[in-house]
């Protein structure tokens, strides 16, 4: 009986794990981001403020949701950081900067590899090709931090996302984070100010309340049915095994009674012979 109960519980858990869509993998590339990103602030402080870093930038990055630009931006960040690394490799005074950039290059390369391994339906092609631009260090690494945050929240399962369509009124002057240099006040890893600013607004735009409710309903129904199926399988197995267990117990009792009768008969014969 104990084995039967254990099997029923195991069956239910397997049903939940295999068929429950609420069990999702979020942040699939989160483990690729190491603590080395904390050195970004130190690197920005070491670089001259008037230094310009080349980057192929996706137009409208601050208007579009992250799934529209994340793949392209990560690839372009890898190219720009690699070029920056090559420039510091020949400068003996910049060994500290070289070490930091080298670690950042490895992180970005790992993220590119992670995105290739986990092809997400959320990731779409940018509506425009990247444009070559030059950024001050703090603006460049602001884009870096935002891309890191977007990748840390990347999911493998497609969700309701907005279309990657640029507003017709978008212009370089309105792309404020590109044209205006702001104090580098971002936390090295989370970039919380950005998350509270543009990232949050993008996510809200990409997942309206109505769509979110429908999405949760669509996930909850299969989860409920999978739970019912698990209980049904467990009940059927118990019902099938219960008669066998009853018959086995009865057979054991009959065998014991037969053995007792045989022993009594044997003793009776021995007594008669004496």
Swiss-Prot record:
GO cellular component, one term: cytoplasm
Listed SUPFAM superfamilies: 4-helical cytokines
Protein modification: A soluble form is produced by proteolytic processing of isoform 1 in the extracellular domain.
Stretches in topological domain Cytoplasmic: 239-274
Principal cellular location given in the protein's record: cytoplasm
Residue positions with a glycan: 90, 97, 145, 196
Keyword Transmembrane helix: yes
Disulphides: 29-114, 68-164
Chain ranges passing through the membrane: 216-238
Subcellular location(s) of the protein: Cytoplasm; Cytoplasm, Cytoskeleton; Cell membrane; Cell projection, Lamellipodium
Membrane topology qualifier: Single-pass type I membrane protein
Signal peptide range: 1-25
Coiled-coil regions listed: none
Gene Ontology terms for molecular function: cytokine activity; growth factor activity; stem cell factor receptor binding
Cell membrane in keyword set: yes
GO biological process terms, semicolon-separated: cell adhesion; positive regulation of cell population proliferation
Keywords: Cell adhesion, Cell membrane, Cell projection, Cytoplasm, Cytoskeleton, Disulfide bond, Glycoprotein, Growth factor, Membrane, Secreted, Signal, Transmembrane, Transmembrane helix
Pfam families: SCF
Positions on the Extracellular side per record topology: 26-215
Function: Ligand for the receptor-type protein-tyrosine kinase KIT. Plays an essential role in the regulation of cell survival and proliferation, hematopoiesis, stem cell maintenance, gametogenesis, mast cell development, migration and function, and in melanogenesis. KITLG/SCF binding can activate several signaling pathways. Promotes phosphorylation of PIK3R1, the regulatory subunit of phosphatidylinositol 3-kinase, and subsequent activation of the kinase AKT1. KITLG/SCF and KIT also transmit signals via GRB2 and activation of RAS, RAF1 and the MAP kinases MAPK1/ERK2 and/or MAPK3/ERK1.
Family: Belongs to the SCF family.
Oligomeric and partner information: Homodimer, non-covalently linked. Heterotetramer with KIT, binding two KIT molecules; thereby mediates KIT dimerization and subsequent activation by autophosphorylation.
Stated name of the protein: Kit ligand
Organism lineage: Eukaryota, Metazoa, Chordata, Craniata, Vertebrata
């Amino acid at each position: 009986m104990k084995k039967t109960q254990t099997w029923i519980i195991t069956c239910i858990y397997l049903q939940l794990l295999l068929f429950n869509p609420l069990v999702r993998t979020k942040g699939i590339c989160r483990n690729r981001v190491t603590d080395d990103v904390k050195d970004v602030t130190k690197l920005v402080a070491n670089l001259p403020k008037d230094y310009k870093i080349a980057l192929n930038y996706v137009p409208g990055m601050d208007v579009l949701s992250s799934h529209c630009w994340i793949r392209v931006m990560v690839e372009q960040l890898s190219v720009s950081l690699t070029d920056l690394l090559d420039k510091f490799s020949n400068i003996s005074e910049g060994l500290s900067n070289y070490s930091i950039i080298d670690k950042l290059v490895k992180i970005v390369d790992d993220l590119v590899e992670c995105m290739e391994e986990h092809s997400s339906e959320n990731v779409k092609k940018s509506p425009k090709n990247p444009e070559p631009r030059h950024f001050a260090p703090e603006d460049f690494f602001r884009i870096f931090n935002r891309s890191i945050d977007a990748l840390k929240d990347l999911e493998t399962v497609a969700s309701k996302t907005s279309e990657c369509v640029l507003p017709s009124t978008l212009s370089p002057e309105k792309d404020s984070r590109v044209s205006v240099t702001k104090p580098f006040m971002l936390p090295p890893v989370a970039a919380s100010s950005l998350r509270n600013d543009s990232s949050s607004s993008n996510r809200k735009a990409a997942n309206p309340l109505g769509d979110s409710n429908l999405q949760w309903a669509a996930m909850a129904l299969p989860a409920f049915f999978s739970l019912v199926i698990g209980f049904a399988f467990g009940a059927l197995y118990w019902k099938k095994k219960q008669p066998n267990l009853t018959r086995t117990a009865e057979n054991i009792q009959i065998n014991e009674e037969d053995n007792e009768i045989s022993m009594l008969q044997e003793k009776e014969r021995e007594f008669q012979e004496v």
